[in-house]
Curated annotation (Swiss-Prot):
This is U3-agatoxin-Ao1i. PROSITE patterns: MU_AGATOXIN. Keywords: Amidation, Disulfide bond, Ion channel impairing toxin, Knottin, Neurotoxin, Presynaptic neurotoxin, Secreted, Signal, Toxin, Voltage-gated sodium channel impairing toxin. It comes from Agelena orientalis. Disulfide bonds join 36-52, 43-57, 51-67, 59-65. Expressed by the venom gland.
Length: 73
């Protein structure tokens, strides 16, 4: 009986740790996207603001860098 209770407690602790790690990774991903800009917005890859997922920063004329949609090429 003690063995069963010990295994249940151990399983609960492992599950809680896995959930905490998943939540932490999700928050880090969200924080990384928080300061991003969308299509045709000014960007600066080296210092920010950075383009959101699915966009890339292109600089045709130096200070005028803008985010363009990533076509996957």
């Amino acid at each position: 009986m003690r063995t069963i209770i010990s295994l249940l407690l151990l399983s609960a602790m492992v599950f809680a740790e896995i959930e905490a790690i998943s939540l932490e990774e999700g928050l880090q991903l969200f924080e990384g996207e928080r300061g991003c800009v969308g299509e045709n917005q000014q960007c600066a890859n080296w210092a920010g603001p950075h383009c959101c997922s699915g966009y890339y920063c292109t600089c045709r004329y130096f200070p005028k860098c803008i985010c363009r949609k990533d076509s996957g090429k």
